[in-house]
Amino acid sequence: TVTNYNLEKFLDFAEQSPENFGIKEDYAKGYDPTFFRASRGHCFIGMDELIKKAKAKGDFHVPRNQFIHITTPVDGMLAINTSRIIEIDASDPYQLSKGLEEGYLQVRELMAFMNKYLPGFEQAQLAGISPTLGVRETRHFVGVKRLTHETMYAPETKREAVAQSAYNIDIHSGVKDHIDLTPVAEPFGIPYGCLVPESLNGLLLSGRTISVDTQVFASARVMGPCIAVGEAAGTAAAMSVDKG
């Protein structure tokens, strides 16, 4: 997180340089400075051209091609989601520790980038650093049902759903600065069977562990669907206790 920035100056610059918007109008209508000024809760994605400029001058080595900031409930504080740790296996504790070390180095470089290149962030100061890495995906349990990209809209999926997701299929490359972002055609359901391990009794799954493929997980991994899946697992557990 950072403080001591001038968001209005940043948005003025963004308004004058539309090439620095990472999400285009034909993808998200109304994704513009007017929206950002009116919304206390937003996620800005862009500054592609400024990052290209910084890379050309040797000032940006983070494997990202876009700057992302997210507003927080704390006035005057922004969360920066622009680091990326690649080419590690996050299921290996040693590699995870090395990734955390790399993350700290990236924070230093990102602060220097913001101070030097981003209008409105010339005097920005570091407010906090996450104590852990945000790991998108490692292992999944094998459930009694596995939801895949091919079956996410199947009739039986809708009938058996205990939660839904409407977020994009948002796959971040683990080896380079690339994101595959594909809108979902419509909200899709997550069947109860994806929460039930195939070979373990007395356990229900939630969050990153559910039985889905990478494409489905790229949508279902975000907060809204995870909250819904967690509630479904808790409800099922309570019903199981009630029924003995």
Regions found by a protein language model. Give the residues of each.
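Flavin (FAD/FMN)-binding glycine-rich loop and adjacent Rossmann-like elements that form
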Residues: 1-244
